[in-house]
């Protein structure tokens, strides 16, 4: 259990290090107006904090820096929310200023604004397409042999595919087929489409359409949309501006980790609990993340959780500001998407 004096000194050390990036010594602390203690007393308390594992020495300075344990205590017990400026609020509102047509575009824009506001790297995990339901199928003929198949989901996700139209299928049959598919499949989850087509819809098509089977496989293949969530990155080079990453080896390790999207995807998928989550350094259990912290929040439509937005920064990140911004964006994103979904 830390004493009140130790808590104060730990908080001031971490606040100062986050702001300056420089190790903090007893002399620096003795000049802080909130610490009315002698240098000798401060040194003794710092020695105790070091022994307890909350701060540690660096090789290049007599000052101390926070350890992972120190940051964890700081995030869990010492943080207070930071007020957003009017400029911050206006930037966040700009995400939703235009009419929403496609959910993924809004999520991507959110990632960009998060990166701009924090000067760190932001990541957004879009909704799982497998959770989407079919809203509409359109087939637009280009000529006698080809057409464009347009698949629209309930979240605004759009897929376009150029397909080959068999010579045995005439335009009126093609139009009839699309009408039957829309009538029978609207509202069906994408993951269930293939099964429903072959078990239920094929019999209806057989009754009404000549040579329906030559076109059916093409339609089924078109509806086979990749079902993993899309991941959007913004500000990946922002990390290079942080002093922690002046070491070329650390930069290489970090960039390699970002490029291996599958590992990062799995990491974000772990952070799918509601609310803000913070993982620091080695807590991320991913090579290249030893000097990084990841802060995540989920967004939803109504009570249905859709995806995750996150900020990746150095362990010396501005936790209070980032958490406040991320919380606001996640909340506003959920509100905007819920309204959009109800109106569509």
Curated annotation (Swiss-Prot):
The keyword GTP-binding does not apply. One of its GO terms (molecular function) is DNA binding. The keyword Metal-binding does not apply. Keywords: Repressor, Stress response, Transcription, Transcription regulation. It comes from the Bacteria. Coiled coil: none annotated. One of its GO terms (biological process) is negative regulation of DNA-templated transcription. Signal peptide: none annotated. Gene3D superfamilies: 3.30.450.40, Heat-inducible transcription repressor hrca homolog, domain 3, Winged helix-like DNA-binding domain superfamily/Winged helix DNA-binding domain. Belongs to the HrcA family. PANTHER family: HEAT-INDUCIBLE TRANSCRIPTION REPRESSOR HRCA. Negative regulator of class I heat shock genes (grpE-dnaK-dnaJ and groELS operons). Prevents heat-shock induction of these operons. This is Heat-inducible transcription repressor HrcA.
């Amino acid at each position: 259990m830390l004493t009140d004096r130790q808590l104060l000194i730990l908080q001031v050390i971490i606040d100062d290090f986050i702001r300056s990036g420089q190790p903090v010594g007893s002399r620096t602390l003795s000049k802080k107006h909130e610490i009315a203690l002698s240098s000798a007393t401060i040194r003794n308390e710092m020695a105790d904090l070091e022994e307890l594992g909350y701060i540690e020495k660096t090789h290049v300075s007599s000052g101390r820096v926070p350890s992972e344990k120190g940051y964890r205590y700081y995030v869990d017990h010492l943080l207070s929310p930071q007020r957003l400026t009017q400029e911050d609020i206006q930037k966040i509102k700009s995400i939703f200023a235009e009419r929403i047509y496609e959910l993924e575009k809004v999520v991507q824009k959110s990632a960009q604004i998060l990166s701009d506001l924090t000067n760190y790297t932001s990541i957004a995990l879009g909704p799982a397409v497998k959770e989407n339901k079919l809203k509409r199928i359109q087939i637009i003929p280009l000529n006698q042999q080809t057409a464009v198949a347009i698949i629209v989901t309930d979240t605004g996700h759009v897929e376009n595919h150029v397909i080959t139209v068999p010579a045995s299928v005439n335009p009126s049959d093609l139009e009839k087929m699309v009408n039957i598919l829309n009538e029978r499949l609207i509202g069906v989850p994408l993951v269930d489409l293939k099964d429903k087509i072959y078990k239920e819809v094929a019999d209806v098509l057989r009754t009404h359409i000549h040579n329906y089977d030559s076109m059916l496989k093409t339609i089924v293949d078109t509806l086979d949309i990749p079902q993993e969530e899309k991941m959007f990155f913004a500000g990946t080079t922002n990390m290079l501006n942080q002093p922690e990453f002046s070491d070329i080896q650390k930069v290489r390790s970090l960039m390699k980790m970002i490029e291996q999207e599958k590992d990062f995807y799995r990491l974000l998928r772990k952070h799918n609990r509601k609310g803000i989550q913070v993982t620091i350094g080695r807590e991320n259990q991913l090579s290249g993340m030893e000097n990084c912290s990841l802060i995540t929040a989920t967004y939803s439509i109504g009570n249905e959780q859709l995806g995750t937005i996150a900020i990746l920064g150095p362990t010396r990140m501005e936790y209070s500001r980032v958490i406040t911004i991320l919380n606001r964006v996640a909340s506003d994103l959920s509100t905007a998407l819920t309204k959009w979904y109800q109106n569509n």
